[in-house]
């Protein structure tokens, strides 16, 4: 194989793997899907309303710089993204950085009610828009890390992410339908949690499910995996805040 073809191989594999990726909402039951689209039936809207209030709260409110929260349309569709300093940030990380560096406030903390609420309200502004994360330039090395994580067998069960979410997508496991494992609906209200939660909380649950190491929320491992999942979802609609079983 020529050097040029070897260089293109990771891209070819990525494109082939994404060929059958479907929006997560297509794997939901009719009842869950209908409730996800109906604010009066979606418990996550309590967090959205709290997030909208947080957007306007404080002397240095988010609204002071950005105006109405509708100005965030399209933002969630572009995350994770590489910041000018070279750090890979998900939407939660971007919110926290804005809070500490520009608002002079203490960080909310990963998985806190306030951060999830603000993230849900911001993500809602991109609902229905196509995922459009950057995967070239400074994002390329992070993408490759995430791809390796996705394809590597892990834990006592010796399973990779792809063995569930590619090879067995559409089949049932513990009464639920296996999706393509995209993060387009997060943050999401999960009925099993009885609360709103982040994608990284869900990834930790997946790690636990295969009896593998659970990495910290916001870890490089989960951030790069999140970027890879978003690359698989490019062109598919943002569903956040989602509703999941």
What does each model-found stretch correspond to?
Residues 24-57, 124-154:
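Electrostatic cytochrome c docking/interface patches
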Residues 104-132, 212-244:
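C-terminal capping alpha-helices of c-type cytochrome domains
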Residues 46, 50, 90, 94, ...:
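Extracytoplasmic/secreted proteins, especially bacterial periplasmic and envelope-associated proteins
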Residues 33, 52-59, 72-130, 150:
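Hydrophobic, ordered structural segments
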Residues 1-37, 41, 49-53, 106-107, ...:
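N-terminal export/targeting leaders of redox proteins
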Residues 58-69, 118, 146, 156-168, ...:
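The canonical Cys-X-X-Cys-His
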Residues 52, 94-98, 102, 106-107, ...:
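A structural feature that tracks compact, well-ordered secondary-structure segments
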Residues 71-75, 171-174:
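Short Cys/His-rich "knuckle" micro-motifs
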